[in-house]
Swiss-Prot record:
GO terms for molecular function: aminoacyl-tRNA deacylase activity; ATP binding; proline-tRNA ligase activity. The gene is proS. It catalyses: tRNA(Pro) + L-proline + ATP = L-prolyl-tRNA(Pro) + AMP + diphosphate. Homodimer. One of its GO terms (cellular component) is cytosol. This is Proline--tRNA ligase. Its EC number is 6.1.1.15. InterPro entries: aa-tRNA-synt_IIb (IPR002314), aa-tRNA-synth_II (IPR006195), aa-tRNA-synth_II/BPL/LPL (IPR045864), Anticodon-bd (IPR004154), Anticodon-bd_dom_sf (IPR036621), Pro-tRNA-ligase_IIa (IPR002316), Pro-tRNA-synth_IIa_bac-type (IPR004500), Pro-tRNA-Synthase_IIa_type1 (IPR023717).
Length: 573
């Protein structure tokens, strides 16, 4: 492609509202243009990147045996009412009404539509398993669209759905999709991790997320460098300490803490380790009879509550944090001084595993401006009603697989696979006849990739002060030819054209910058848009039969023979 025939729309500065590096750079590089809040046009340069991602996704899905189809973006209300999601999906769903006053939505996802297809078309076990996918624009009415394509209202997604006669068959396809996703991200040249994840609102059983690693990632991940263990922090198990609880050595005593309402402040006042303090978190849950139950969740002072884990404790599936009024009612003191000692039988105490082995610890006294020191289970308060893993793991915790220690990093979720089982097929009565002629509900899997989100995530992972550093598989062009004095030197023009033709004939994506711009402007643009390889041609070098070659990730250029440049580029690619 000749730059004079292309549309390059680079900018020196990014709009002030752009926060993430990817958002700033995509706007500056002219990959996207903002139309409205969370709405972006993919410009020719950006669309080349997006299409390359789509191609790799499509190739790997086809290789895995999935069948591509395309479903309507607009979906009728009636389908969503069958699963109950019309009422519960929330304001993220864009609801529309046609001229006949019939309600529809602009699809945020397609479980209902594909299940409707399955129940209409699949009759026998002989037709299963089947695995469908589509690459399509989705819409979710984000309350605060931000971060460019990372959290846009309109986005491109690959969503896939599989149907099976058994859990074993579902597991086989699930494993195949796991490998296909790994292949996709490896081919894209991204550093990523697949982690066990919570199934969330979509529901079901098994679930894995695929995260591109980036310091700006919204999600915290736990992994072990010495094994394959990796999980979202929401699910990473914090093992119980191996050491037993120590014997009491200190007497129980009250300590004045007039202004200290946090574990950090109390530890600083008393000159003790934060690990010797216990924080008490008051929550309220509703039991099966509809009655409110008050709980104290006990955590070590240096640990943080994991709400996903806590919700899995019996009785806490729908807990909420207690109000100040409720705390005063049950414990008789304001927040900041609450603790488990001396509480009534109406207060249910749940201790994290790390708290259960503590002795001589410090906690709130349930009296204003007072804490207790030298607290011990069995002597000063009963053993906890429940001991469970309710905290986030921290750096250095033992890995749950016993093969080393946990490390933490940040990630951007770009893919998610679920074992939905019969959640949707039961709701929509999607059945088949088994070998005995009996009706059975189909088992179902769900597999999503944020295609447009991948572009933003790749830029978050690869950028510097000069601009974007695209992986080779995603770059809009593989090679840029930068001729100096193009509009003034026939020798430069001739060499540039010859090299352009030779590389293009080899099937290499080449951008020939024939705009006649000054070298500084030309180099800045080519670095900004992230082309992996640059060849500079000038009169001075041509006299010696040489050109300059520089990889986007290299600190400086190197002088090479013009006769060797094609083989150098081919080897680099």
């Amino acid at each position: 492609m000749r730059a004079s025939q292309f549309f390059l729309a680079t900018q020196k500065e990014a709009p002030q509202e752009a926060e993430l590096a990817s958002h700033k750079l995509m706007l500056r590089a002219g990959l996207i243009k903002r139309l409205g809040s969370g709405l972006y046009s993919w410009m020719p340069l950006g669309l080349r990147v997006l299409r390359k991602v789509e191609t790799i996704v499509r190739e790997e899905m086809n290789r895995a045996g999935a069948l591509e189809l395309l479903m309507p973006a607009v979906q009728p209300k009636e389908l969503w009412e069958e699963t109950g999601r019309w009422a519960v999906f929330g304001p993220q769903m864009l609801k529309i009404r046609d001229r006949h006053e019939r309600d529809f939505c602009f699809g945020p996802t397609h479980e209902e539509v594909i299940t409707d297809i399955a129940r209409r078309e699949i009759r026998s076990y002989k037709q299963l398993p089947l695995n469908f996918y589509q690459i399509q624009t989705k819409f979710r009415d984000e309350i605060r669209p931000r971060f460019g394509v990372m959290r846009a209202r309109e986005f491109v997604m690959k969503d896939g759905y599989s149907f099976h006669t058994s859990l074993e068959s579902l597991q086989q396809t699930y494993d195949t999709m796991y490998q296909a996703y790994s292949n996709i991200f490896n081919r894209l040249g991204l550093k990523f991790r697949a982690v066990r994840a919570d199934t969330g609102a979509i529901g079901g059983d098994g679930s894995h997320e695929f995260h591109v690693l980036a310091d700006s990632g919204e999600d915290a991940l736990a992994y072990c460098e010495h094994s394959d263990f990796a999980a979202n922090v929401e699910l990473a198990e914090a093992l119980a300490p191996e050491h037993p609880r120590g014997e009491p050595k200190e007497p129980l005593r009250e300590v004045d803490t007039p202004k200290q309402t946090t574990c950090e402040d109390v530890a600083a006042l008393l000159g003790i380790s934060l690990q010797q303090t216990v924080k008490s978190i008051a929550v309220v849950a509703t039991d099966e009879a509809g009655n409110s139950q008050f709980y104290l969740l006990l955590l070590r002072g240096d640990h943080a509550l994991n709400e996903v884990k806590a919700a899995k404790v019996p009785g806490l599936s729908s807990f909420r944090f207690a109000s100040e009024l409720e705390i005063r009612e049950y414990l008789g003191c304001p927040p900041g001084f609450i603790g488990p000692v001396g509480v009534s039988t109406q207060v249910n105490v749940v201790a994290d595993r790390s708290v259960a082995v503590m002795s001589d610890f410090v906690c709130g006294a349930n009296k204003p401006k007072l804490h207790l020191a030298g607290v011990n289970f069995g002597r000063d308060l009963p053993e906890p009603m429940i001991v469970a893993d309710i905290r986030n793991v921290v750096e250095g915790d033992p890995s749950p697989d016993g093969k080393g220690c946990i490390s933490l990093c940040r990630g951007i979720e770009v893919g998610h696979i679920f074992q939905l089982r019969t959640k949707y097929t039961e709701a929509m009565e999607a059945t088949y006849l088994d070998e005995n002629g009996q009706k059975q509900f189909m088992e179902m899997g769900c597999y999503g990739i944020g295609v447009s989100r991948i572009v933003g995530a790749a830029i978050e992972q690869g950028n510097d002060e000069r601009g974007i550093i695209f992986p080779a598989a995603m770059a809009p062009f593989s090679v840029a030819i930068a001729p100096i004095g193009y509009d003034k030197s026939e020798a430069v023009q001739s060499a540039a054209h010859a090299l352009y033709d030779e590389l293009s004939a080899l099937g290499i994506d080449v951008l020939l910058d024939d705009r006649g711009e000054r070298p500084g402007v030309m180099f800045a643009d080519l670095e900004l848009i992230g082309i992996p390889h640059r060849i500079v041609i000038g009169d001075r070098g041509l006299k010696e039969g040489q050109v300059e070659y520089q990889a986007r990730t290299a600190a400086s250029a190197e002088t090479v023979a013009l006769a060797d440049i094609v083989s150098i580029v081919r080897q680099a690619l």
